[in-house]
Every structure is written in structure tokens, then in C-alpha cells.
């Protein structure tokens, strides 16, 4: 398998996980929905955090969120996302169970578009050189919420979740050789219909937290000496967390033997720190896409990848930039040879950092670590209880997912890894 397959680990037969931090008896929750103030539509992936702490989460695809607090003190809650003016609201003002958070678009002035145009390759080269200045030089332990879902057509056929720890070595070396992931607890819920059984297994799962951290892992997108292998273009800048961002689109101009990516990268104009990337696997070579992600399939089954996309975002805290959120969507078709029709599947995973310990002496041993070739779905049990994550921060499930869970629970038993 090519280089991409080593780093885009994702496990299919696949399904959902979540992480958080344990809270004291005085814990309380703030919750609500984040919407665009102009069109009233829900805003997804809004970063929501407690000021002065490393605690946070993101809004779900409907804009809904919940954030657990370790005590009842009045702490400011921050809301930020690309293209919108950030907000800071006292937690006491969010005592209602049905809070509506309205965020305004933050337009970029024409003068800013003109002034901050420049050579995209030079900007990227400088940003790569400044990684040791802009990212943690400590050994950090991230607490993360992780979730996987899989749909057959429009119908959910499985979901799995886990609380995970992610050990990160310093960013001055762009290598993930010693970064590791450990599953603390997890659960899964699957359809009991035999026709929904999917024997395809795709590499990855919780190791996305290590493998697609493109700032730390030079093998995901490009290293400095590979910049000439890509075409770059300056796009219209955007604001994120009140800071102007360069937006640079890229696509490969030199084709390799492994799957490659095209997409957009966001770079903080002042710090020249990478803050976000949206990228997809080049769709013109299905063989390379398959080699990058397929771990195992039954004989006679045809696997046809349609789309493989990633979003990776980072958050600026006290002058340093930290990994914050990762999502991966994979669309593919499967059928047995000599069958007339194929089935369409969508596998989706996402994870968010909910807490962080900096400069820690804690380690994850190789024995405890989630291995590159392990399949997450295979190592967590079935269990589904409403209070399972009562003392953890998670990404709230969407309404469609909640309905799917209710239907799946009616079809059979569920298990848990305690």
C-alpha cells in the first residue's frame, strides 16, 4: 500500500466514539443551538470553550451543543468559527436549556483582500518553517471525543463512540512515530439485519488524531521540499476567531504512485500558523484510493470509493496553536460480482479535543496503544444507555442520529467496553 494508506487510518465495519473529561459533583451543563443571525440556520463545527481552561467541544451538524463545566462558577463561554464574529457569553447567562446563540458573518473588506494577497508558496514555506514557534514543544496528552457512523443509503446501520487519550510529542519534529492513541472506554450499536452486515474493513479509526494532523505529520499533505510539486492559488481571505486568515487552495501537479489530495489551507496572517485544512483524495484514480484505505474485504466483493474528505482544525490558545477537531467522510459502493445493483454507503467519523494536559509525564505504552491495523469496531462491545456519557463532554448527536439510535435499539441488544 502507498504512503497515504499508512497515515489515513480509518476503520470500517466502523462506527462511533466519544471522549470527555470526568467532572466533579458540582458539575453543570450549558447547552443550546448556534445559528446564523441572518438566515437562522444551524452552524456546525463551531468551537465552544470555557475561557481560561482547555475544556471545550464543537456544535453538531444541526448547530446543537452541550458543554459540561466542572463547577458552578460564572465562567465565560467562547464561540468561534470561520467566517463569523466570535462571541463570549457568561455561563450564568446560559442557564436556560434552550439557548439560541446568534453569530454574525464577519465580512472581509476589499482593501484586506488586496493588501494581503501574496505568493502562496512563500507563505506556505514560511508557515512550515515557523511550526516550532507556533505549536507546542511539550509532551501533551489530549482528551478527545470520537464518533463513527455508517449509513446504507440514507439509513443509519451502525454507530460507535469512545473516550480516547492522544499522546503528542513536541511539534518541532514533524513526525508521529512516537505519538499514540489509547481507548479509555467505548460502545457500539449496530443493525441486526443480516442484509446490513458489511464485511469491508478500512484502516484508521481513532488513529486519525495522529495520522491526519498534517502540521505534525509531514506525510499527510506536503513537506517543505515537496511544495514545488503542487499548484497553489490565493483565495479570498476569511476571519476565524477574530483573526484574518490567508486561504490557499492546492492541487498536485506531479502525480505519485500513492493517493494524493487537493483542497484549501487556512493560515493565520499574523502568526503564519496553520489553523485549518479542508482536503479530499484525488478522485481520478480509484485504484490509488482503494489502496490507501481498504484493509480487508471478502472475495468476490467489489469496493468502489466515491469520495474521501477530511477537515482538520486547530485553535490558538495563549500564543500557541493546538489540534482541535478532525472529521472524515467516506462515500463508497459495494457489491458482489454478477449482481446488477450496488449498495451506497457513507462512513463518517469526527473527533474533538475536550481537554488537554500540557507538559505531562504521562505516556501511552505500545501495549496499551490502539494499533495502526486494529479495527475500532472490533474491540468495543455493544451497549447503549442514556447516561453512558453523563460525566463526559461529547459532540451532541444530531436529531437524525438520535432517531436512528432509537430504531437500532429496538432491533436487538447493545454492548459496552467498561
Segments predicted by a language model, with ranges:
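Short, acidic Ser/Thr/Gly-rich low-complexity loop/linker segments typical of extracellular
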Residues: 54-64
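A short, solvent-exposed loop/turn motif at the edges and junctions
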Residues: 50, 78-89
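Hydrophobic beta-strand segments
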Residues: 46-50, 77, 115
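Surface-exposed, low-complexity/disordered segments
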Residues: 102-230, 241-244, 293-294, 299-418
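Short Pro-Gly-centered beta-turn/loop motif in secreted/extracellular proteins
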Residues: 40, 66-74
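Structural motif
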Residues: 29-43
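Extended beta-strand-rich segments in extracellular/periplasmic secretory proteins, especially
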Residues: 218-269, 273-280, 315-316
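Bacterial Sec-dependent N-terminal signal peptides
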Residues: 1-33, 48, 110, 418
Amino acid at each position: 500500500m502507498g504512503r497515504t494508506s499508512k497515515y489515513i487510518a480509518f476503520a470500517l465495519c466502523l462506527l462511533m466514539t466519544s471522549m470527555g473529561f470526568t467532572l466533579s459533583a458540582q458539575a453543570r451543563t450549558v447547552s443550546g443551538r448556534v445559528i446564523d443571525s441572518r438566515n437562522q440556520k444551524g452552524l456546525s463545527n463551531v468551537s465552544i470553550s470555557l475561557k481560561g481552561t482547555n475544556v471545550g467541544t464543537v456544535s453538531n451538524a444541526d448547530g446543537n451543543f452541550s458543554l459540561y463545566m466542572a463547577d458552578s462558577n460564572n465562567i465565560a463561554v467562547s464561540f468561534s468559527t470561520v467566517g463569523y464574529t466570535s462571541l463570549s457569553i457568561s455561563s450564568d447567562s446560559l442557564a436556560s436549556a434552550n439557548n439560541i446563540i446568534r453569530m454574525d458573518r464577519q465580512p472581509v473588506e476589499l482593501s484586506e483582500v488586496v493588501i494581503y494577497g501574496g505568493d502562496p508558496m512563500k507563505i506556505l514555506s514560511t508557515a512550515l518553517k515557523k511550526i516550532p514557534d507556533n505549536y507546542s514543544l511539550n509532551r501533551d496528552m489530549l482528551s478527545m471525543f470520537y464518533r463513527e457512523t455508517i449509513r446504507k443509503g440514507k439509513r443509519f446501520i451502525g454507530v460507535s463512540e469512545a473516550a480516547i487519550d492522544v499522546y503528542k510529542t513536541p511539534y518541532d519534529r514533524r513526525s508521529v512515530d512516537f505519538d499514540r492513541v489509547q481507548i479509555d472506554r467505548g460502545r457500539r450499536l449496530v443493525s441486526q439485519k443480516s442484509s446490513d452486515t458489511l464485511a469491508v474493513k478500512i484502516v484508521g479509526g481513532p488513529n486519525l488524531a495522529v495520522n491526519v494532523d498534517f502540521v505534525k505529520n509531514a506525510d499527510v499533505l506536503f513537506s517543505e521540499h515537496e511544495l514545488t510539486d503542487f499548484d497553489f492559488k490565493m483565495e479570498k481571505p476569511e476571519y476565524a476567531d477574530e483573526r484574518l486568515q490567508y486561504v490557499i487552495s492546492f492541487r498536485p501537479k506531479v502525480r505519485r504512485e500513492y493517493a494524493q489530495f487537493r483542497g484549501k489551507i487556512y493560515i493565520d496572517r499574523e502568526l503564519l500558523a496553520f489553523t485549518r485544512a479542508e482536503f479530499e483524495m484525488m478522485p481520478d484514480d480509484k485504484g490509488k484510493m482503494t489502496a490507501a484505505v481498504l484493509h480487508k474485504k471478502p472475495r468476490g466483493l467489489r469496493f468502489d470509493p466515491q469520495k474521501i474528505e477530511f477537515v482538520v482544525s486547530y485553535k490558538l490558545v495563549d500564543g500557541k496553536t493546538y489540534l482541535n477537531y478532525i472529521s472524515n467522510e467516506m462515500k463508497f459502493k459495494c457489491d458482489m460480482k454478477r449482481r446488477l445493483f450496488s449498495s451506497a454507503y457513507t462512513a463518517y467519523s469526527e473527533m474533538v479535543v475536550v481537554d488537554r494536559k500540557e507538559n505531562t509525564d504521562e505516556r501511552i505504552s505500545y501495549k496499551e496503544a490502539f494499533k495502526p491495523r486494529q479495527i475500532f469496531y472490533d474491540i468495543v462491545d455493544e451497549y447503549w444507555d442514556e447516561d453512558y456519557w453523563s460525566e463526559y463532554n461529547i459532540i451532541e448527536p444530531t436529531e437524525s442520529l438520535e432517531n436512528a439510535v432509537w430504531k437500532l435499539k429496538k432491533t436487538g441488544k447493545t454492548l459496552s467496553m467498561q
